[in-house]
Amino acid sequence: MDIEAYFERIGYNNPVYTLDLATLTEVLQHQMRTIPFENLNMHCGEAMDLGLEATFDQIVRKKRGGWCLQVNHLLYWALTQMGFETTMLGGYVYIVPVSKYSSEMIHLLVQVTISDRNYIVDAAYGGSYQMWEPVELASGKDQPQVPAIFRLTEENETWYLDQIRREQHVPNQEFVNSDLLEKNTYRKIYSFTLQPRTIEDFEYANTYLQISPVSVFVNTSFCSLQTSEGVCCLIGSTIARRKFSYKENVDLVEFKNVSEEEIEDVLKTAFGVSLERKFVPKNGNLSFSI
């Protein structure tokens, strides 16, 4: 595995860099705009592999994406290779339909320490929940970013990441009440502790999320990529685009259903993804939102 190949994959062309917040932010933004957050393997009859070598091959060499256990694992490796002080952490995702956090640790995220300050770095939550900048590990501090305001709160050594969102305009009235549309302006995202983790700690989650009938990844196919203006998602056979702040304090959210014949072209043009096997889009009862 070669860090230069990773830099080429994300379009990062700075041969001389400083291990500071500006560099960390730049790497995060390059990765999130070139590497999709996706689970397409599962809907092409393939497994989501946890190993770093397999992840590097899929994302860097084959120019695919992956889910958090792959995409953030790659980011953790790259930042460590660059010389950043990194710690792998595990998160518990907030499940909106049941109004509670997952009982299992199913999200991988990264902590980076710079000049005695700690930051949460996450390139693989996807949709409009994706941070565009590292979030400083400071309890109760509102941290405005392009997608939304992010807020971390610490209670009894557990940290909670929340998001304060803008109003939104949906031109296609067919989707105003759709489950694909995030309707909360205050959104809980996930919780985590600062206990260091290894990739082996996620083996159960990697299996569970691929086989459980209540796993959103089993129920729904998705592909999400951040853009210069917002985010583009393919959820099942619906393409959704959110433009952040298209006017003051309002996001524009557009939806369009695409035919099976259009899917391959959408994946190539919107996400830069070419699949080796036949893809069967799926949007079940458990779905993602934008």
UniProtKB/Swiss-Prot annotation:
Positions of the catalytic residues: C68, H107, D122
Enzyme's top EC category: transferase
Protein's UniProt keywords contain Zinc: no
Binding site for CoA: S103, Y208, S287
Enzyme Commission identifier(s): 2.3.1.5
Major location category of this protein: cytoplasm
Chemical reaction(s) catalysed: an arylamine + acetyl-CoA = an N-acetylarylamine + CoA
Disulfide bond entries: none
InterPro entries registered for this protein in UniProt: Arylamine_N-AcTrfase, Arylamine_NAT_domain_sf, Papain-like_cys_pep_sf
UniProt keyword annotations, A-Z: Acetylation, Acyltransferase, Cytoplasm, Transferase
N-acetylmethionine modification, residue list: M1
Sites where the protein binds substrate: I106, H107
Alphabetical list of Pfam families matching this protein: Acetyltransf_2
Function: Participates in the detoxification of a plethora of hydrazine and arylamine drugs.
PANTHER family membership: ARYLAMINE N-ACETYLTRANSFERASE 1 (PTHR11786:SF2), N-HYDROXYARYLAMINE O-ACETYLTRANSFERASE (PTHR11786)
Protein known as: Arylamine N-acetyltransferase 1
Organism: Mesocricetus auratus
Gene: NAT1
